[in-house]
Amino acid sequence: MTTAKSGTTIEIIGAVVDVEFPRHAVPKVYDALQVDENNLTLEVQQQLGDGVVRTIAMGSTEGLKRDIAVKNTEKPIEVPVGKETLGRIMNVLGEPIDELGPINSKEKLPIHRPAPSFIEQSGTTELLETGIKVVDLLCPFAKGGKVGLFGGAGVGKTVNMMELIRNIAIEHSGYSVFAGVGERTREGNDFYHEMKESNVLDKVALVYGQMNEPPGNRLRVGLTGLTLAEAFRDEGRDVLLFIDNIFRYTLAGVEVSALLGRMPSAVGYQPTLAEEMGALQERITSTKKGSITSIQAVYVPADDLTDPSPATTFAHLDATVVLSRQIAERGIYPAIDPLDSTSRQLDPLIIGEEHYRVARGVQETLQRYEELKDIIAILGMDELSEDDKRAVRRARKIQRFLSQPFFVAEVFTGAPGKYVSLQDTIRGFKGIINGEYDELPEQAFYMVGSIEEAVEKAKSL
């Protein structure tokens, strides 16, 4: 029996479910449909005509049969927002998955919303200190900016992300939202306990749609996290939004696109790649009410930065932190590439003359060393001029001083984590490029915090 608001399933292929409605009551695209018998939510993706809509399931379609009643909720998926979500883990539908009872929020918001209009948006040039030397010096983050952590498999995107959350959440004392998009469940679990032990869990809302979830779930979980962040922003707060991993969002889009029968474009990606990325990224912005500072991990397939997925993401970011396998192989962590990473904030008008000069000096020294590497490999160090020898020695010290022990890696390394203030970072690197520490051995600069620690370490070597 079908009423005006209900339809029936007519075809099920994997995560795609076709539902037939009376012709005068066809659901709109992005409306949420409810299958009560299987407790399943479907999201309308296409209207096929004759009252039939094609939907993507937000959960498993196992056991779903034809001719089951489907109810139209007549609105998009809505999720709870506000302070009640802090310290809780939710799924894509905003349902708690931490077994701590229901989330009694006063308000629910749809996950599909237009981006703030041009007039509502606001820019800012205030810097966000992270306590990580290489980031603060060479690719500083802006409050209300967007940052991408680019890296291939196993170079430390998630560890860097967790360190940033720990440092910023503790020092910044604002609210954070973490969206786990298609990542490992183990990492989500580790992250939850890490937050609990650092006593910052009551300031973080967690939204997980991990690797084992169906593609529709992974495609929408980023929007769920974003909706929570937007709600905090519209209350007038400065909120942090962490997304791990934006590539899996694209990948879920590829799967959904293929299931819906669209013709793939370059490298097999969906033809709507740029539009899907824009729909998410354009909403991550600061308005006159408050700001969203977003830090996103971006997996780089086969370490190829020109792949359409990372290349599309680049266009939306204010700062890019590129993690390099070559640096990781040398045992320097965080394995951030000081020459490849960039930031729009690296401007003397924003960061000040001294910071700018030191950052450029560090990059020039490292660039000179890169250029001399071939000569050193063929002829050896002895063939270089005195100036070049000095540049190489300083560059090697800078490379080591760019490493730093992390708080979240204490368990593995046994070395206590270090938070280095921006002033200490600038002072340390300024000293190295000015030759104040030329007599210290290279090893003294490895895995220390401030320059004073390097001087202390040199005494024991």
From Swiss-Prot:
Binding site for ATP: G151, G152, A153, G154, V155, G156, K157, T158
Domain of life: Bacteria
Cell location: Cell inner membrane
Pfam families with a match to the protein in the record: ATP-synt_ab, ATP-synt_ab_N, ATP-synt_VA_C
Subunit structure as annotated in this protein's UniProt entry: F-type ATPases have 2 components, CF(1) - the catalytic core - and CF(0) - the membrane proton channel. CF(1) has five subunits: alpha(3), beta(3), gamma(1), delta(1), epsilon(1). CF(0) has three main subunits: a(1), b(2) and c(9-12). The alpha and beta chains form an alternating ring which encloses part of the gamma chain. CF(1) is attached to CF(0) by a central stalk formed by the gamma and epsilon chains, while a peripheral stalk is formed by the delta and b chains.
Membrane topology type: Peripheral membrane protein
Keyword Cell membrane: yes
Main location: membrane
Organism annotation: Coxiella burnetii (strain RSA 331 / Henzerling II)
GO cellular component: plasma membrane; proton-transporting ATP synthase complex
Job of this protein: Produces ATP from ADP in the presence of a proton gradient across the membrane. The catalytic sites are hosted primarily by the beta subunits.
Protein name: ATP synthase subunit beta
Keywords attached to this entry: ATP synthesis, ATP-binding, Cell inner membrane, Cell membrane, CF(1), Hydrogen ion transport, Ion transport, Membrane, Nucleotide-binding, Translocase, Transport
NCBIfam families in alphabetical order: atpD
